[in-house]
Amino acid sequence: PGKVISIISNKGGAGKTTIAVNLAVALAERPNARVGILDANLQFGDVATYLNLVPRASIADAVAEGDILDEMSLETYMTVFNDRLSLLAAPARPELAEAITGGNVKAILSQLKKKYEFVVVDTATDFNEITLSVLDESDAIVVLAGSDLPTLKNMKLCLEILQSLKYGDDKVHIVLNRANSAGGLSVQQVEKSLNLKFFATIPSDGKTVLPSINHGIPFVLANHHSAVAQTVFQLAQKLAPQEVSAPPKSMAAKVLGIFS
């Protein structure tokens, strides 16, 4: 089965959707990879906008299908970004989210895992039934931290909740977004405040990130060589290490090997 990676933050504007989208695209850049994104911010999710997609259907339509949903029928509700990446979008209107339960989300994730090597999930900012269901099904939880005091206060609460839910350090990964942004605390100050070491840090780079959002082109594609894109590729590698195959032996090496 595929690996489920959820991105969470209990503070709006932390860059959750930006990181979720670019992480998914980075994973999809791997040879032969197949990646699904689930927008589980059911009321106000905008993953589709970040990818410049107009969804033909959403998770609400998939849930309305009922118990007969399987990985083949789920395909009809996905919106294709490219041949390696597809999105199951949030409902078009907030009220449509009311019919979707945590059980529905778990069932859908179960089917997505059968079809995709990686399933990246963007979430709402509150620990509601939907978010908790996503976390239960996740193999890795990326918690986004910021370097301002209100975000740090919320971050401490978020980590306490995750601890109380018995999610281990092997599953929860704290990532500092917009590291060393102007006016923010340094990486070292934030680590000291939270009493932890970050799994990864992503630099602040509004000149790359904002145009990418406004044009609906993920920066890992539009600005592949930028520092912010490279750190997302590194994050993808840390979350799901890619095995580097040994280069094929030359004919001379093979011949010499016979006599060794």
Which residues does each PLM region occupy?
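Acidic-aromatic/histidine active-site loop/patch
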Residues: 1-4, 164, 171-172, 176, ...
